[in-house]
Swiss-Prot record:
Enzyme class: isomerase
One GO molecular-function entry: triose-phosphate isomerase activity
Gene Ontology, cellular component aspect: cytoplasm
Assigned keywords, A-Z: Cytoplasm, Gluconeogenesis, Glycolysis, Isomerase
Keyword Cytoplasm listed: yes
Protein source organism: Cenarchaeum symbiosum
Protein name: Triosephosphate isomerase
Keyword Cytoplasm in annotation: yes
One Pfam family, short name: TIM
Binding site for substrate: N9, C10, K11, I145, G179, A200, S201
Amino acid sequence: MRSPVLIINCKNYEEAAGGRIRGLADAAAGAAARYGVRIAIAPPQHLLGIIAGRDLGVLAQHVDDKGTGSTTGYVVPELLKQSGVSGAIINHSEHRVPADQVAGLVPRLRGLGMVSVVCVRDPAEAADLSRYCPDYIAIEPPELIGSGRSVSTERPQVIQEAAEAIRGAGGVKLLCGAGITSGADVRRALELGSEGILVASGVVKSADPAGAIGELARAMS
């Protein structure tokens, strides 16, 4: 995915359930075309097939370092690829995995031509996990996730320190998330060194999700 990028994590919010995910995906695709910004959406896992294959990045919210075959219940990269999914979020604060799984998953996704977005809690973890050279490192201080208090205003130094921490990591790009709700939050994050945004409740639980997507995308254009 080219920069800048906006990733919308729908988590397991009821606002993204059933057919409502199509409305979010349509709004995201429209904003991407209007503002020339790359947008990806991570729907609830069981809804991946509904929007996969659209002219829109589609990410799994989690992926397992397991193989195809007799691996009941696991989310397998190769089957995601065959279903039109373009990449995966790894190590989200709500679904943490050991570093050795990150080490296995990042090259596996790369080998399939898929995007890896590795979430970290702080600059130290950014430095540690960037050695596996994912496409993106997403810095999200857990205390700000879903708070409505933006990392770019509450903890701006975290973005700057994370950008510095991954500087020598072979083209890894920095995203930031946690509390992003407005175009002003986005602009500030980009000024601080982020190359994109990972957002969840600020869009999905908004009274006007399409309007929220448009505001964030416009700030990145």
